[in-house]
Amino acid sequence: MVIPATSRFGFRAEFNTKEFQASCISLANEIDAAIGRNEVPGNIQELALILNNVCRRKCDDYQTRAVVMALMISVKSACQLGWFPERETQELLAIIDLMWNGFSCPENVTSCVNSPVTLISQVIERFYPCVKLGHILVSFEAKPESKMMMKDFHISKKMPHSPKQKVGLFVVRTEDISRSNCIVHPQGVSFLLNGKGIDKRVNISMESGPQLPTNVTALLNLGANLLQAIGCFGGSYLIAIAFMDVIPLPNKPLLKDYVHPEVVGSNSDCDIIEGPSRISLSCPISRTRIKLPVKGHVCKHLQCFDFWNYVNMNTRRPSWRCPHCNQSVCYTDIRVDQKLRKILEEVGRNAADVVISADGTWMVETENDEDVELVPETTHDHGDPNSFINLGPTVKNPARDENEMETSTQVEEHNPCLSEIQGPSNDTHRPASDYTMLNQSHTSTNTLPQLPRTLNAFDGQQFVNLPQVINTRDSPASQALPMTFSPTPSPQDILATNAANFGTSMPAAQSSQFQGSHVTSLGNCEGRTSDLMARWNHIYGRVQTQFPPAPLSHHHYSMQNQSPSPAQQRPVPSYIAHPQTFHVNYGENADQRWMPSSIAHPQTLPVNYGGNTNQRPIPSSIAHPQTLPVNYRGNTDHRSTPYSITHLQTLLNYGGNADQRPMPSSITNLQTLPATYGGYAHQRPMSSSITHPRTSPVNYGGTPDQRPMPSSITHPQTLPVSYGGTTDQILNPGGAMGQFSSREFMNLTPANTENWRPQSRMRGSVAPGTGYDHMIIHPTRPVHPQAQTPPAPLSTSYDGADEIQAFIGHPSYPVSNNETQAGTSSLPVAEGLGYSGSFWSMPPETW
């Protein structure tokens, strides 16, 4: 036979490779469409001739062979439906089998088991009681050595099925179908249907454990379909694709009765005598009342479970194991316990347990006989102080709480009155947020709120905004003990702080009028202090049970007129123009926090609770948030709070030794204060201007030691800070370069800093006079616009008296009697900077 020049199926005598592949795919689609419609083409003889020549065509590449194989799969379905005469059918099937061997091993291909319907029906009866089996499309058996298998089948519209039926994939291990392990998918095998992976049956979405039949209706096509299994099975499996229906459970299931084991008389004293057993009438699956008590036919226990709960659970995940003894109990092994069913019908609804004796008698135990009373869990609102004040006693289990920390669970506290917090005041227009305390629970781990903080570093005529990351190390010791604005706070006020108004500021005008009548006396809170301090000392092992009384302050928070303690008072800066960084310590590690750039007058309140700390006194004039360094057990913790305080320079020391050191009286440009992070430090510049030093230390139970700091630092200074023995030094632009430790910086005087040089050669430095002179970077004169050319530097030091007097005369910054003016600086001045090169000589738009 010779193929005609033009065929009605689209084939011609001569084809190139691409045209041949496209024609094969088109012919396969036409055959599949005819099979789906259950129709037979008219010119079968011509089609048989074309297919015979296609199979005999020499295919050199794998792509062409795959296309021809796809066409032959459709032709095989047509042969099975009787499209061709007997002789042509045998010839085509022989050619197809020959080509099939090139894509699959012939020894691994098994048509089907002897009775697939019987085996699948048994599996459905045992493990899929809600599934009804329909027409089986294809079934075959995979052997343990099988690695790659293919099976084709066809679907037509005239197949016996209902529109509601679905097509499911069944994978069953044939060695033992009595347990649910037989429906576990082989973990090393992936199934593909028409080239697409089947959900939960491929290696990328494999599901362990027993599986339900997989719905593959969306992956099928009318006509020929191809199922592929790739991987090692490791056992004998039955794979089948069949129509199935999902049916509901019967209202009255036909179940067999449970046969109780016979009680054998005991003649030996060594036999165990069974006593009464307590049986729960609640299902162990849902903890609800049992409706139909069932258990497995091999179960030996008396406890039953509900039939409906058990079946519904296994229809979602068919594990089919007893919830009490974990034995395999498939659907056909479920038995009804008629004895317990009779008990459920006779007892009332309030019965929770029954006691069944060995002779069959039983007795009801109701819920009222329970000795254990459930304690509801209490959720506390950390923002509501009444959450803990109204907390009642909590019942605990002594057996559970043996190894837990012994702490009191009953808190008897009272809300602080508003009058106690504010004190008498004549100003009725002051914002309420100025009197709000930081309110935190003593059980909170994050004791203080954390705000994003930035540092505005002055660099030439620009400000560089440097974000800082806050790292809080919480420990049992660092509990919520924030300070209020009162210099003599009570422990009740210390324990309660309010984070809601964090960031509230007070204008400078109101801050300057803030009267000392708002100061809360410790004596007013002593009635509420003893029980709280006893609780605190019980938890943290303190001996002191009450803070010593503190003197009252009645005028502008000005405590300068009080009699000083044995400590010698030193001047403290009164005005800080830019954010300043102070020391923060968490658990023997110091943490440096930058204050927000919008804060014009930061202030530090170093507080020490029972430890030794080196604190720096604080400036006196504050119009915006301040920094509260708090020390718990020898560790310093500085937190920023938003209280508007004008003249508060108090160093509080409770039960420890405080080392107070004044800060420089005038710092006009950049300055970096040392900080330590667990033995490691990093320097970051800050802009500050301190013109009015003032110190008012108050000491409670300690011996402060105050030492002066340099009186004037007029230019940027780099202060290296030790990181566990490693110094990381960062130069500020246009400033002098120096290297100090924390204690060396505190002991600096103008006399010993004028000609300071490092004691040893610094690592990485290049000495002059060597062959590397050309690599030394020399400072250059800063370039300024012609319109703003600064005058030549007057001298290496200048007298800032005029500048200081200008700020003293400013009405927003009150001056006390002990304010001092900044002296002249003995440090060298950078080239190009003099009186006009200071920060205050810059235009306002560059601040």
Swiss-Prot record:
Pfam families the record matches: zf-MIZ
Pathway assigned to this chain's UniProt record: Protein modification; protein sumoylation
Disruption phenotype: No obvious growth difference under standard greenhouse conditions. Altered sulfur metabolism. Reduced growth in high osmotic pressure (mannitol) and in response to abscisic acid (ABA), but enhanced growth and fitness in high salt (NaCl) condition. Abnormal steady state levels of SUMO conjugates in various conditions. Released transcriptional silencing of target genes (e.g. LTR, SDC, ROMANIAT5 and At5te35950) but unchanged DNA methylation levels; the expression level of these genes is higher in plants lacking both PIAL1 and PIAL2.
GO MF, one annotated term: zinc ion binding
Zn finger (SP-RING-type) location: 268-349
Keyword terms, alphabetized: Ligase, Metal-binding, Nucleus, Repeat, Transferase, Ubl conjugation pathway, Zinc, Zinc-finger
Assigned EC number: 2.3.2.-
Binding site for Zn(2+): C299, H301, C322, C325
Intervals holding Sequence repeats: 569-591, 592-614, 615-637, 638-659, 660-682, 683-705, 706-728
GO cellular component: nucleus
Region (7 X 23 AA approximate tandem repeats): 569-728
GO biological process: positive regulation of sulfur metabolic process; protein sumoylation; regulation of gene silencing by regulatory ncRNA; response to abscisic acid; response to osmotic stress; response to salt stress
Tissue note: Expressed in leaves, stems and flowers, and, at low levels, in siliques and old leaves.
UniProt region (Interacting domain (IND), required for interaction with MOM1 and PIAL2), positions on chain: 113-271
InterPro entries the record matches: Znf_MIZ (IPR004181), Znf_RING/FYVE/PHD (IPR013083)
Subcellular location, record wording: Nucleus
Main location: nucleus
PANTHER family to which the protein is assigned, alphabetical: E4 SUMO-PROTEIN LIGASE PIAL1, ZINC FINGER MIZ DOMAIN-CONTAINING PROTEIN
Role description: Together with MOM1 and PIAL2, regulates transcriptional gene silencing (TGS) independently of changes in DNA methylation. E4-type SUMO ligase that promotes SUMO chain formation in a SCE1-dependent manner and thus contributes to a pathway for proteolytic removal of sumoylation substrates. Involved in stress responses (e.g. osmotic, salt and abscisic acid ABA) and sulfur metabolism.
Family to which the UniProt record says this protein belongs: Belongs to the PIAL protein ligase family.
Subunit structure: Homodimer. Interacts with MOM1 and PIAL2 to form a high molecular mass complex which mediates transcriptional gene silencing at heterochromatin regions.
Protein name, as recorded: E4 SUMO-protein ligase PIAL1
Organism (species): Arabidopsis thaliana
